[in-house]
Structures are given as structure tokens and as C-alpha cells.
Amino acid sequence: MSCSQRLRLFLLPIAALLLAFSTDAFITVAYGQPQTPNGRAVLTGVVTDAETGDPLQDVNVFIAESTTGTATDAQGRFRITGVPLGAHRLYVSSIGYEPAAQNLNLREARVYTIDFALQPVVIEGEGVTVEAERDEKWQERYAKFQRLFIGETPNAEQTEIKNPEVLRFEGGVGSLEAYSVEPLIIVNRALGYRVEYFLREFVATPGRTRYDGEPLFEELEGSVNERERWDKARREAFYGSSHHLMLAMLAQNTERHGFKLYMRPASGGSFDGNGGPMGGGSLRAGGQRYPIEVGDIMKNGEVATERVLDFQGFVEVVYLGETETEAYTTWLDQYASSGMIRRNVPKFQTSQFWLERGPATIDYKGDLVDPYGVTVSGFFAFERVADQVPKEYRPR
């Protein structure tokens, strides 16, 4: 799963984890491949205390889901150069303040000035919990958090949260809520990344899980053999992901990249109580689907570098490049009930996506201007933090 899937909102209707990202409603139009703009942008600004107006030093300022970021100087100033044009989410965070973010759609190669005034916040609760004070209940909550946040794939087995003591857990029977008082430091030795994850909210209740946060990636240093292994693993994580799909759709060659697209009308098959289709690669019996072309769901945008997804119902995606993994089929069996699909043998990786907020704009990089408009399920949603690569990643 690519990080352009925006790990902001997950819904877990028993057999599928649903993830928020951005999409639209149904129209058949002809369109061309979006143009790639020339030049780069520069982001500058000042970060201040909202109450006093004083500049804030050493504030994290970064482009979410990327490797690009910086920190403010003594005057609260920041400057990020060489930013590709298109859609980005600029995120600002400092301990003791409410984080802030702004969605950007950079269409011109120029300097953009974005100032932030952060609101002070009092962090309630106890300080860092030492190992000896973490009781059995804490360990149970943490284990559940790891499964739902890091994931249950082979890559998750090589991914470690280095500072779990910054997590705060709440919740009663069957529910779990969490947030971090400092960025989570996650080391992914499967893909070769150190990730700072700024987790604002995590909520898991029976049948539903969601979390909201922003990752900043940094490549790990490694030996020649390690770098070769990471390069292979990153390619595997990218191929078949939602970001791979978006780039293939923009290039109008989905089949060449191994994707088959189908439309399922909203009235076909069964939907869960939250208004979304059941995940896990299929609907309950009775759902109808028919093959579609990219032009059936995508139209020209306002400018030549953008396209707009626009459809009703939901799109089912079959990736012929890989079959379902054993970890995925085990996950399905674990969460499936008698009324849902069970998978006896692996099939090609199958996912769905549908609209949350109406038409959504995609830039030439495959990034969504509004990161919250689309929900995905099936294999796209099964792969979580341990399978993310930075949004600018492209296979070499």
C-alpha cells in the first residue's frame, strides 16, 4: 500500500479494513493523459504561538507521507525547497501545541508563504510510563494497537515502534482509543525506513477502526545487501497498491500494469451498516459487476495537470500481478462471519474504492487534492503502516 492512500480513516466492517483517501461520482468522458508541469515550488513561512505571538523554534514542518521536511529556526521561520508541483499536505507539529495542517495544490513554480499560529495545549495524564509500570492490561491494549496500526503482514513482523511509552490508551470493554504525546518512532527493517508518525487519534470499536495522523519518512542506512533487499521490498510494496493504480489510470494503461476495473452499482449486493460495501475482495451473494474503462470514471480537471474521478456506486479493482497472500486469507478467516465471504483458496488481489465526498481531483503524480474523499477496502486496506512507502517513491 502506498502512502498516498492517506492512512487517516479506517473502517473495519468485520472482514475488511476501510481506508480514507479521495474520489468521486460517475460520468463517461474522453480525456487525455495529464501534463507534467515544469519547475518546483518553495514553501516558506513563520510558526508562532497563537496566544503570545512569539516565534516557535524547532517545530517540525513537513510534507505528509514524504521524506521532505525541516524545522523552524530561532525566528520561527521555515523554508522547504524543491517541492514538486501538485497536491501536498503541509503538516506542523510541536510538543505542547495543537498540530496544524494545510492542504496545498501547487500549480505554479514560485514561492508560497504559509504561516501557522499554533494553539498551546495542556497534555493531561501521567508522564512516561516505565516498563515495570506497564501492566497486563496495557500490554493487551498495545498488542491490539500494533495489529490494527502496524498491520499483520510479513513486513509488520520486521517493523517496531521504538517508543511505545508515548502512547496513551483509553477505552472500555471491546473498544480501544489511543493517541501519542510525542511522534511515534517506527523502524521498518523490511522496507528500510525510519518513520516519525504524528498520531492524533486512534479509535477501535467492534466492527470499526479509524486513525488519523501523518508520517514523515527517512531512509535507513544499510549495507549493500540490505539496500538491495530494501529496494526489492519497496517495489513489491508499491506494485498493486492504490498509488500504483492511480498512476496507471492517469497513464491510461491499467491493463498493461495488471489492473482490471469493474463497476458495482450501489444497489447491487449487500452493504454494511455504515453505508459501505463489504470488503475482503467481494460482496455477499447477489452483487453484480461489469467491466469499465478509465474514461468511465475519470474526466478532465480544471487544468491540464489534473484529472477528476467522478462516479456512483463503487469500483472493484483486480490486480493480476499477485495473488492474495497467506497473511491476507488468514486475516479474512479471522474476521469473517458465517454471513460473509470466506476464502478457501487465494485469488488475485481484489480491492474496492468508492466515494465519500463527491468528485475528487487527482494531480499528475497520482496524489489526491482532498485526502479524505474516497474509501477503500479489500487488499488495499489490509496493508497498513508496515507496507507504506513515501508518496514520491517510484520503482527503479
Regions found by a protein language model. Give the residues of each.
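Beta-strand-rich domain onsets/edges
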Residues: 27-42
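Structured interaction patches on ligand/partner-binding surfaces of diverse proteins
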Residues: 70, 98-114
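Short, acidic Ser/Thr/Gly-rich low-complexity loop/linker segments typical of extracellular
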Residues: 66-77
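A short, solvent-exposed loop/turn motif at the edges and junctions
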Residues: 63, 91-103
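Bacterial N-terminal signal peptides
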Residues: 11-25
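Surface-exposed, low-complexity/disordered segments
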Residues: 118-396
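Short, ordered, surface-exposed loop/turn motifs in non-cytosolic proteins
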Residues: 41-43, 50-65
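A short, amphipathic beta-strand motif
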Residues: 41-49, 76-78, 116, 127-128
